[in-house]
């Protein structure tokens, strides 16, 4: 009987541990409505340090039975506001996330290549892409995550990841329910 209880306890602990480390809930913090302050380089991969600052909103909802989510983004950029959509999906086999971006200003263009990665101390995601006809590496980092705030950074690397230029920084503040 003691052996049976020990085995059942071990199975329960193993199942709980597997659920806790799976990663499927890593983006749950993002579900809801956010005010976002953005700081983006005016010119990317050109040695520029001049940033454009603007505000926006993001509304995120779960999808794929909780193994994904969709974010509707609004950017109040000087020169004309626009929208974009982020789609995130979790792969249970690799325990990693894929993130796709669709810009509303160019909605008929193909989706950007998915960024892939996972959360450890922060969420870090990479993709190979092109910028102005040149191959680049893209990196996104989610950090400083609390129930009411989060920090996001995008960086490009023109040299395969040896050096990085952080070109977009966003600070998220959860909107109060109305």
Outline where the language-model segments fall:
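Bacterial N-terminal signal peptides
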Residues: 5-13
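Hydrophobic small-molecule pocket/channel-lining residues, especially in calycin-type beta-barrels
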Residues: 17-178
